[in-house]
């Protein structure tokens, strides 16, 4: 067979033309040690801080320690089958979670994967869990209220949209109950809610989800779960994931409320990771950046102005401000608010609601201590009605506590002191409230008016509770339209004052309480 050199060269040219090199540069490394969910990797010269590292078995780790000759990373999920010598790869991606309206009514894990058995989630895209908080120029002052439905909170420590209000207290003082009631009260307010459960028992979380469903609040709530059985990495990242889901609504000119339950457990998870990564421990064995852990999270809760929203949505939403309100929860040990993490979070937030064990055990629930509970910015967000009528409540309670301490030692008291003590007792009784019974603005206003205008003076302390419940039932039955309008407007003027007095007079005359 005669080979023609021209044909051969043509054939070679054709082959060369068809030759296609598809090569992809990948940074790979090798696991050198595995211990308690933390892996050390040799190689990965191009890895970024916080980057996702692909592991065998469709799992990921997050790079946290970038050292001279190795990388320390935390595994997202089970790690028992990882071993030395396994190959890992850089992904070039930062951890992202699904965001959007499709998440409302769903229970998801830290990675945004559904765990409620209701099928796939129809999300609107993905968002990185670590985002820089809006700057000063993009923010607007807090001047709209978030009604929790609790008399003690809405009257004395009001919360505004875009505020960070800490709920702090020992275990079993009603911290979660307060936060869950605040979520339930947003059923008809248009505020979307995110509940982040960190390091809690699965049975407790399922109970919370059931209660939200029973009260019709789950449909506008996202529940993010990193239970006690999850790895420390997932517990540490859960609040950031929940925050990214809340920012979706904030940046589109809507209002959202996020509850972190609780950040003490997140700090403990972060401490565990840091110690395993051999970072130097500081006070209470926490790492040096534990303040930054919480500050970068809570600074993302803000009220953003209309320009920011318009810019973010490329002009699709105009003239609307957005907000993300945060209710972080911190658990104290034996009422010690001067411990490391509590003082950090108190200094970051715009006020705190302090729940006291002695109040709770005495039957004062919610167990809010009005003496050291404050709201630094919420006052400007209070409705006119509550602002005008709640002024005397805090003063009455402060005077009552002071006098009650002295009254223990005094044998005879003058009439003025006796009157103040009696009024203080009645106000304390009035502020008691059962769980899952949030109050409307009008109901709150009417209760406060009864205390402010002296209608409780001739009511015995034991009868204050029944007096109030009968008064509210009477008002809802006979003045339904007025109560509805008042809840909507939250206004206060001479006409409204006269109407409230008319309701109280009429009730006192006609009703057997």
Curated annotation (Swiss-Prot):
Key word Membrane present: yes
Main location: membrane
Membrane topology: Peripheral membrane protein
GO cellular component: plasma membrane; proton-transporting ATP synthase complex
Transmembrane residue ranges: none
Leading EC class: translocase
UniProt entry keywords in alphabetical sequence: ATP synthesis, ATP-binding, Cell inner membrane, Cell membrane, CF(1), Hydrogen ion transport, Ion transport, Membrane, Nucleotide-binding, Translocase, Transport
Pfam families, alphabetized: ATP-synt_ab, ATP-synt_ab_C, ATP-synt_ab_N
Catalytic activity, as annotated: ATP + H2O + 4 H(+)(in) = ADP + phosphate + 5 H(+)(out)
Subcellular location(s) per record: Cell inner membrane
InterPro entries (alphabetical): ATP_synth_asu-like_sf, ATP_synth_asu_C, ATP_synth_asu_C_sf, ATP_synth_F1_a_nt-bd_dom, ATP_synth_F1_asu, ATPase_a/bsu_AS, ATPase_F1/V1/A1_a/bsu_N, ATPase_F1/V1/A1_a/bsu_N_sf
Family from the record: Belongs to the ATPase alpha/beta chains family.
Known function: Produces ATP from ADP in the presence of a proton gradient across the membrane. The alpha chain is a regulatory subunit.
Protein name, UniProt field: ATP synthase subunit alpha
Species annotation: Glaesserella parasuis serovar 5 (strain SH0165) (Haemophilus parasuis)
Taxonomic lineage of the native organism: Bacteria, Pseudomonadati, Pseudomonadota, Gammaproteobacteria, Pasteurellales
Protein encoded by which gene: atpA
